[in-house]
Structure formats: structure tokens, C-alpha cells
């Protein structure tokens, strides 16, 4: 579909992509250009984010503000499957287009699809943009008179869901057919659309026909489209598709240890420890920090650095231990730590593991031979790491980007983030980071602070000042103390330059049982705003900010996590921040967040409230060797001052990820 998502040309269908599918799309339709990303988050839900370039209008009439850039607009679509197609009944879906912005293409629709051989037939009713033909009576108008007229414009400062507009006003019929040719890569589409183009943001457009036709050609993961619309306009487009469940990377890796022909040590004294430790690193990705071995039990304290899948990591390590340790040892303990704070004990039944790993039982199930538990107090006391202090230095690239700016649609900054630190003991360390800008086009900024009247303190809208102060910028410099409070409780205290725009002191406590679907934490912080003129100094603005946060992985929505944080934000507004994340089989995580506070849409300004999206991608999808770690790419349509949280450099939910993994 031209605007993104599964559809014909201008009209959606009730069809869905396979779960986990992601498509990146570009279409050119004369007066409009569309850039969009569509995702199939669940089998029954499709979502699309879109930028529209209105080529017949300027971004603004002020040349010093936006020059000759054409008007850009953001839009969000969502579609839900209500009924899955059967032999006799069609697929039925309900959808909302451009429901969370300025409403350029705001529409609601319900449609049905039925396949018959190589043909796929579609029919639907549309309201809003899809209903401007007004060729049938709005069925809801018969129920309540308020549905007969659709309100104009949008509420607040844009960015809000105008639910009061839903299914109101003119209604039109739309539909079409898709024909899959005998050539698998080629399909034809024809549709009757419901819009009359008399109310478009590009101006009143000529429509010689309601019929649109065209072809789709697929080459590998690309779709190329060519169409003829409105009886007078040629359009074209290209889409790239992948599946976030099935995407993989070929790995060059050592095979897991073969234990069928293994010759374990006769007793503890004869263990070849050098070979054991080397194998744990090279084949198991497990770096040892301390070991306690007796006649019945072996405990290995360390950290997994290569394999993000917990079962793969455990079974690789288990095979090595079963190959090297004497059979008199009945239990292996793989105790993992984060920053020398114990997090998790994976207990392996040695005899059962050997039997299942060598297929000596009728129905082997290796995962049933081990369990994950919290480290005991005895293990905490016995843990004597070979190194508790020392320095480190690391560097990585950073990429900052911004879409839809008045100066230029796409602004970017590329650089190197250099991080250094020193650990004094298990609990305490100091850390800092410096940004070095290598390449950017932020010099295109026509203004550093917008001219809107600031009702709230400018806690984020001065961001342009902070990112343009020079080639080298001190990003953070802070000290942190982290420790285990009790079996399922952790705490930390920190202070310093905590993020680019704020410094201060704070603390956090987190309750997180092993493999629990629930976690709960509280953080409290006192911060001052850093000076963008001298990053070592502060402005006068200060605030207390903190949240009570609940994390929940609901059983009825597999591979998802919901985070709800209630408290006070940086601008001293109060409310909640809600974050919803979905994980796919490849490890890719897609999420969305929004803040709802006691600040009105008018006080907040453009966008009405803080919201954003992100995608988190594991590094091992890009490299040939197994690797942990990931990169995150956020997209915040409008960032103003309300509903903004402190970006704390150390967060216990990340530190304790081992205890109930969601990201890894």
C-alpha cells in the first residue's frame, strides 16, 4: 500500500504479514512522498509509522526558519484482525490510520478479504480520509446523531488520539482485487477507493477515476511497484522486507564439547584445570573468576560473554564440565555475577545431564537436568574473585539522528564515545565518558532554542545547545556503589554528572526474583541542570525526580514486557510513564513508550505529550562470532519538556538482567 502496511494502493485490506515481519517502504505519488516502516507485532496486529512529504506546500512561510523545505508530517497506523479467514468466512480487520498526529490522512475502516484461487477479493467501509466520497450512509449515524458530522482539525497541539472523531462523518465503500499471476514474483492489483481528493493537504487534486491499478514485482526481499491512480497519476515505490523472528547470522564457532567419548578425571586432584578453564572460555564463553571444587560439588563463579541464549550457554558449559570433572561430583553450580555482584546460580544435576546429553534415556531433555536459582548466602561469602579492582577503557561509535526538522528532514551526528572507569572493590567504582564528534550536519540548525512560550522549565528543549558545543564533550562522570541487599533485593547509590543535561545524586532499590514475571523498584534523585556553556558547571535549575516502577511480563502476551513508572519528572510534573516492549525470536526487541502527566496538551506544546519508539538489535546478528550486547535506536517524534525522565547511567533492571532475561 502507498502509505505503508498491507493493502492495495490507496486502500488497506484485512490481510496481515507473517508475525515478526518488518517492511521498510518508499513510495512516490506525485504530490506526496511516503517513507514508512510497518511491523507485524502479533499475528493479529499490524503497526505502521510514516513520514509524509507534501511536495506542494512549504514547511513554513518563514524562509529563515525552514528555507525551501517542503512540508513534512508524521503519522501512525494500526490494524487489528477480528476474525481469521476460514473456508467459508472471510478475514475481517479493523483499522485506524494516522490516528495519533495532525490527522492528514485520519481514517477508520473495517474490511473483509477472501481468497479464491489466485484471486484475493477485498471490500470495506471507510470513514475520514477513506470516506470522503460519501457514497453510502454512515451506519452509526442511524444510532446516534453525533456520528453524522465529523469534527474538523485535531485536538491539543497535535499528537493526541482524537477518539472523539472515530467513525463519524461521511462514509464510503472501497474494495478491490489482487491477482497472483502464474509467475510467483508478479502480481496485479486493482481497487475502487473511497477518497475524492477534495480535502487533501496537498490541495484539491484532480480525480478522473476512482479506480487505481498497478503491478507488484518481487525480487528476493524487495518489492517494486508501479501504479496508475486517479485516472491521471503514475506512482512507483520500493519495499524491503525481513522477518524479526527468523533473521539469523551465520556463525563461525567451535562445536560444543563431545561428551560421548570423554574421559573425565578420576578424582579432584587429577583435574587438568588449565585445560578446563581454557575450554570454558573458548567453547563455553564463560570467564572464570573463582572456583570451589570438592568431592561432591563444583562451583564456578564467572560471567558469560558470548552466548545470549541461556540454555545454549548452560549446555555448552555443562558439556565441558561433564567431560573434565570426575563422576563422583554430583552437582555443578554455574554462578554468574555482574560487576562482581552475584546474580544467578544455575544448578546442574551431573548424572542426569550426562544421561540426557549422551542420549542414554528414551526421550532426552537436557533442559530438565538443571535449574536456575538465587545464589545462597554461603556462596556470597565464599566468593573470592581473583580481581576486585582495576581500570578499564573502551570506545564505541555513537549515532544521533533526528527526523522531520525544519532546517532539513534528516540531521545526524556520528562520533566516538570513549568510556573509562576504575573499580575500587566489588561494590564501588568511578566512571566517565567523553563524546568525540567526527561527522555531523548540526551546523544547519537555524535556532538553538525554539521560540514557543515555555510554560515548563526547559529541561529538554535546549538539547540543540548541548549537542553543538564542540568536538569534545564530557558526557558523564560519576561514582556508583552497587550491592546485594538480600536474596532477591539489590540497591545502588550514585552521584556526579549523570547524563548530558543533568547531574546530581540518587539511589535505587530493586526487587527481582529469579525467573519471575514481575519486578519492582524505586529510585529517588536530586539533580541540577548542567550548563551547556561549561559542562563542568550547573545552571540554577534543580529538581527532585524519582519513580516507583513495576515490570511485568504477562503470560497471556508471550515475549512482551510492560513497564509502568509513577512519580515526578524532570520538569516537576507528575504522572506515569508506560513502556511496552515486544521481543522476537531473533532477539530483536521493538518497543513504544509514553508519558502522561498533570500537564495539559496546551502547556506541553507541540505533540501534546511525550512519546516515542525504539528498536533494540543484538550485536550477534551482525558478526560471525557469538557475542552479547546490543544497540538501541530510538525515535521520538517530538521531544519537549513535559514527561521527561532522568537518563540514569546505571539502572538495576539492566544490571540484574541475568535473573529473568528479557533482552538476553
Provide a role label for each language-model segment:
Residues 24, 35-39, 76-80, 110-114, ...:
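Residues on the lipid-exposed face of transmembrane beta-strands in outer-membrane beta-barrel proteins
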Residues 18-22, 33, 43-45, 88-92, ...:
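Outer-envelope beta-barrel architecture signal
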Residues 144-146, 151-161, 165, 169-171, ...:
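Flexible, glycine-rich linker and terminal segments associated
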Residues 22-26, 37, 49, 78, ...:
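Membrane-embedded beta-strand positions of outer-membrane beta-barrel proteins
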Residues 41-43, 79-86, 116-118, 181-183, ...:
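Outer-membrane beta-barrel proteins
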Residues 22-24, 296-304:
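Short, aliphatic-rich beta-strand segments
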Residues 29, 49-77, 81, 87, ...:
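Outer-membrane beta-barrel translocator/channel fold
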Residues 1-104, 116-117, 129, 161, ...:
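Transmembrane beta-barrel domains of Gram-negative outer membranes and organellar outer membranes
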Amino acid at each position: 500500500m502507498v502509505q505503508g502496511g498491507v493493502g492495495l494502493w490507496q486502500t488497506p485490506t484485512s490481510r496481515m504479514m507473517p508475525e515478526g515481519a518488518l517492511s521498510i517502504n518508499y513510495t512516490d505519488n506525485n504530490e506526496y512522498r511516503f517513507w514508512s516502516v510497518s511491523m507485524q507485532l502479533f499475528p493479529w496486529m499490524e503497526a505502521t509509522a510514516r513520514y509524509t512529504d507534501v511536495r506542494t506546500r512549504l514547511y513554513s512561510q518563514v524562509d529563515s526558519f525552514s528555507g525551501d523545505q517542503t512540508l513534512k508530517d508524521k503519522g501512525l497506523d494500526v490494524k487489528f484482525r477480528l476474525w481469521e479467514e476460514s473456508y467459508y468466512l472471510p478475514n475481517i480487520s479493523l483499522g485506524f490510520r494516522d490516528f495519533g498526529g495532525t490527522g492528514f490522512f485520519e481514517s477508520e475502516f473495517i474490511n473483509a478479504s477472501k481468497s479464491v484461487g489466485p484471486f484475493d477479493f477485498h471490500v470495506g467501509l471507510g470513514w475520514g480520509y477513506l470516506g470522503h466520497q460519501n457514497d453510502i450512509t454512515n451506519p452509526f449515524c442511524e444510532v446516534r446523531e453525533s456520528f453524522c458530522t465529523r469534527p474538523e482539525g485535531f485536538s491539543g497541539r497535535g499528537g493526541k488520539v482524537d477518539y472523539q472523531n472515530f467513525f463519524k462523518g461521511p462514509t464510503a465503500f472501497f474494495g478491490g482485487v489482487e491477482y497472483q499471476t502464474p509467475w510467483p514474483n508478479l502480481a496485479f492489483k486493482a481497487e475502487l477507493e473511497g477518497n475524492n481528493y477534495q480535502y487533501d493537504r496537498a490541495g484539491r487534486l484532480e480525480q478522473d477515476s476512482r479506480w487505481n491499478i498497478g503491478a507488484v514485482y518481487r525480487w528476493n526481499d524487495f518489492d517494486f511497484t508501479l501504479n496508475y491512480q486517479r485516472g491521471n497519476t503514475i506512482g512507483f515505490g520500493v519495499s524491503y522486507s525481513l522477518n524479526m523472528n527468523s533473521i539469523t547470522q551465520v556463525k563461525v564457532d567451535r562445536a560444543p564439547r563431545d561428551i560421548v567419548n570423554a574421559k573425565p578425571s578420576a578424582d579432584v586432584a587429577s583435574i587438568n584445570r588449565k585445560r578446563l578453564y581454557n575450554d570454558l572460555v573458548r567453547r563455553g564463553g564463560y570467564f572464570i573468576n573463582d572456583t570451589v571444587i570438592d568431592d561432591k560439588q563444583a562451583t564456578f563463579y564467572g560471567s558469560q560473554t558470548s552466548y545470549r541464549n541461556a540454555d545454549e550457554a548452560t549446555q555448552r558449559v555443562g558439556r565441558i564440565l561433564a567431560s573434565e570433572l570426575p563422576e563422583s561430583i554430583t552437582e555443578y553450580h554455574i554462578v554468574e555475577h555482574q560487576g562482581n555482584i552475584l546474580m544467578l546460580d544455575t544448578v546442574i544435576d551431573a548424572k542426569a545431564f550426562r544421561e540426557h546429553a549422551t542420549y542414554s534415556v528414551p526421550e532426552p531433555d537436557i533442559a530438565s537436568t538443571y535449574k536456575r536459582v538465587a545464589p545462597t548466602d554461603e556462596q556470597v561469602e565464599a566468593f573470592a574473585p581473583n580481581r576486585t579492582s582495576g581500570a578499564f577503557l573502551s570506545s564505541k561509535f555513537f549515532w544521533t539522528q533526528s527526523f522531520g526538522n525544519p532546517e532539513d528532514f534528516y540531521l545526524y551526528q556520528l562520533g566516538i564515545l570513549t568510556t573509562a572507569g576504575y573499580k575500587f572493590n566489588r561494590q564501588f567504582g568511578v566512571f566517565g565518558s567523553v563524546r568525540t564528534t567526527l561527522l555531523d550536519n548540526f551546523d544547519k540548525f537555524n535556532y538553538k532554542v525554539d521560540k514557543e512560550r515555555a510554560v515548563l522549565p526547559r529541561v529538554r528543549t535546549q538539547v540543540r545547545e548541548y549537542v553543538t558545543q564542540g568536538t569534545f564533550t564530557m558526557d558523564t562522570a560519576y561514582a556508583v556503589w552497587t550491592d546485594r541487599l538480600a536474596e532477591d533485593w539489590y540497591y545502588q547509590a550514585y552521584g556526579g554528572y549523570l547524563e548530558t543535561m543533568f547531574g546530581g545524586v540518587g539511589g535505587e532499590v530493586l526487587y527481582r526474583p529469579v525467573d519471575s514475571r514481575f519486578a519492582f523498584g524505586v529510585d529517588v534523585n536530586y539533580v541540577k541542570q548542567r550548563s551547556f556553556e561549561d559542562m563542568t558547571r550547573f545552571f540554577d535549575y534543580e529538581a527532585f525526580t524519582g519513580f516507583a516502577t513495576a515490570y511485568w511480563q504477562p503470560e497471556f502476551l508471550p515475549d512482551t514486557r510492560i513497564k509502568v513508572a509513577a512519580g515526578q519528572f524532570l520538569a516537576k510534573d507528575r504522572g506515569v510513564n508506560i513502556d511496552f516492549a515486544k521481543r522476537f525470536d531473533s532477539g530483536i526487541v521493538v518497543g513504544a513508550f509514553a508519558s502522561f502527566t498533570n500537564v495539559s496538551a496546551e502547556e506541553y506544546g507541540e505533540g501534546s505529550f511525550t512519546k516515542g519508539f525504539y528498536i533494540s538489535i543484538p550485536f550477534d546478528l551482525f558478526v560471525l562470532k557469538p557475542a552479547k550486547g546490543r544497540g538501541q535506536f530510538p525515535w521520538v517524534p517530538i521531544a519537549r519538556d513535559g514527561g521527561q525522565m532522568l537518563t540514569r547511567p546505571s539502572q538495576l533492571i539492566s544490571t540484574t538482567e541475568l535473573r529473568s532475561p528479557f533482552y538476553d
